Amino acid sequence: MIYGIGIDIVEINRIKKIVIRSGDKLAKRILRKSELKLYYSKEYPVRFLSKRFAAKEAVLKAFGTGMSQGITFSQFEIFNDDLGRPMLRFFSQAAVLAKKLDLVRTHVSVSDTGLYACSIVIFEC
């Protein structure tokens, strides 16, 4: 059964302006250490950050709570499996909520063009 669906789209140029203005502050705020390591290794880090930002916003929307239940961007990470598919891993309060909701599967899809990054997340119980 589908519990929640979240979708988000972000202008890559908006994220680029934030990075130009404040350096890696945004990256450090929303990415976990493993994601931050990837961010620093990318040829196009702003594009990577834009996609992660859209995906993390979509996760919060799929939970249906936003940040109101104490869930923050750093309490979950998006990683790629051996086939390159984006996957989710929960920590802290996000893990507690995922367990409480009895989530059995999560689906993440991320895409980008020259102008936009978008993501959709589906939670199944």
UniProtKB/Swiss-Prot annotation:
Mg(2+) binds at residues 8, 57. GO terms for biological process: fatty acid biosynthetic process. Keywords: Cytoplasm, Fatty acid biosynthesis, Fatty acid metabolism, Lipid biosynthesis, Lipid metabolism, Magnesium, Metal-binding, Transferase. It is found in: Cytoplasm. GO terms for cellular component: cytoplasm. It catalyses: apo-[ACP] + CoA = holo-[ACP] + adenosine 3',5'-bisphosphate + H(+). One of its GO terms (molecular function) is magnesium ion binding. Its main location: cytoplasm. Its cofactor is Mg(2+). Its EC number is 2.7.8.7. Pfam families: ACPS. The keyword Metal-binding applies. Belongs to the P-Pant transferase superfamily. AcpS family. Transfers the 4'-phosphopantetheine moiety from coenzyme A to a Ser of acyl-carrier-protein. This is Holo-[acyl-carrier-protein] synthase. The lineage of its organism: Bacteria, Pseudomonadati, Pseudomonadota, Gammaproteobacteria, Enterobacterales.
